Amino acid sequence: MSTATPKVGFVSLGCPKATVDSERILTQLRMEGYEIVPTYQDADVVVVNTCGFIDSAKAESLDAIGEAIAENGKVIVTGCMGVAEDSIRDVHPSVLAVTGPQQYEQVVSAVHEVVPPKTEHNPLIDLVPPQGIKLTPRHYAYLKISEGCNHSCSFCIIPSMRGKLVSRPVGDVLSEAERLVKAGVKELLVISQDTSAYGVDMKYKLDFWNGQPVKTRMLELCEALSSMGVWVRLHYVYPYPNVDDVIPLMAAGKLLPYLDIPFQHASPKVLKSMKRPAFEDKTLARIKKWREICPELTIRSTFIVGFPGETEEDFQYLLDWLTEAQLDRVGCFQYSPVEGAPANDLGLEPVPDDVKQERWERFMAHQQAISSARLQAKIGLEMDVLVDEVDGEGAVARSWADAPEIDGSVFIDSTAVKPGDKVRVRIVDADEYDMWGELV
């Protein structure tokens, strides 16, 4: 009978959705008595959760797999890159098993094959917290409400990796949120591939939470989450009419006044080639309406420059749209062909690399001026911030306008706080990304 504690190393790459997948696998392994260790040398086997969205992410995943093989030798691969098993085995033929995303049971079974769980383990020692194993700091957590996507954007292969939209029952989502809040989480980050489509696949089926009926729909989900007394932040939202319904909740202080909306472009021609919603004029009107209802609303977005067929006229249209939209937080990527994406077969003229680089630089300079002006306008305001880190020089916090890892920070010249504290500050300075505040 084996009494030694089996040990697993874990490498998690990619987006927040992949982080949640990793957390679920780790939680199951911990429940079975496995110890999660931080080094290759101490592990009996290493699991690598990969990203396969763009070429640079694939290269990073292959490098991580190679490092794990070199340092440990026993490696199981999962995640989005796992849907193309040959592309992994061609480079690393010695991997023990390959699975795709969301295949939690197959990953755990593969671990069993390499190092079986203890025949007996003490549940008091191997106790897993009610909220499960989390890879984020204790005070915030990702809350995944669905898998997959019903869109067919020509630059994207996510539906081929993660499938069509499958919403989680709202009762399950809210019960998980409750467990997280009881465990000390101060901020819930709602994630999916398309948050505004939540429940469409289930025809907004009625479910139950705490004995009360709740529809599986974005508005009802947000209303219930807003009753939990923590920050609730919405990510991956499409600018559909039903988003209008949640803006009053933000204006009333029940949800963070923050929307993460991946617009990708503004030129109607480019949006059509991307197979994205091409209603940029209606989108501007919608943004204006949202801000009339909720003046504090922060909008973050991502864009692609250099998409095949993009002309200088299209790009200038995008810059003019940014001036009109006055977005707060913006990321920009140069288009990179993705293997298997429909955009490869559109027959459009590729944009030369030097032109893509030049447009990216112009885009960033243009948006930085907008972002800087919007942050400068906050100097002198008082606001609540959530502390993420504290060191000998001070604290790093975030306001309602700042999602972790992707947005800016609020720096506080004080060590009299600790991570997870919500404190009030007065903003005294700002640049294009960050702000500086004093405790009030």
From Swiss-Prot:
Cellular component GO terms held in the UniProt record: cytosol
Cofactor: [4Fe-4S] cluster
Keyword Amino-acid biosynthesis tagged: no
Listed InterPro entries: Elp3/MiaA/NifB-like_rSAM, Methylthiotransferase, Methylthiotransferase_CS, Methylthiotransferase_N, Methylthiotransferase_N_sf, NA-bd_OB-fold, Ribosomal_uS12_MeSTrfase_RimO, rSAM
One GO MF term attached to the UniProt entry: protein methylthiotransferase activity
Residues the record lists as binding [4Fe-4S] cluster 2: C149, C153, C156
Keyword Glycosyltransferase: no
UniProt cross-references to PROSITE patterns, sorted A to Z: MTTASE_N, MTTASE_RADICAL, RADICAL_SAM, TRAM
Keyword terms of this UniProt record: 4Fe-4S, Cytoplasm, Iron, Iron-sulfur, Metal-binding, S-adenosyl-L-methionine, Transferase
Domain named Radical SAM core: residues: 135-374
Subcellular location: Cytoplasm
Main location: cytoplasm
Protein name: Ribosomal protein uS12 methylthiotransferase RimO
Organism for this UniProt entry: Ectopseudomonas mendocina (strain ymp)
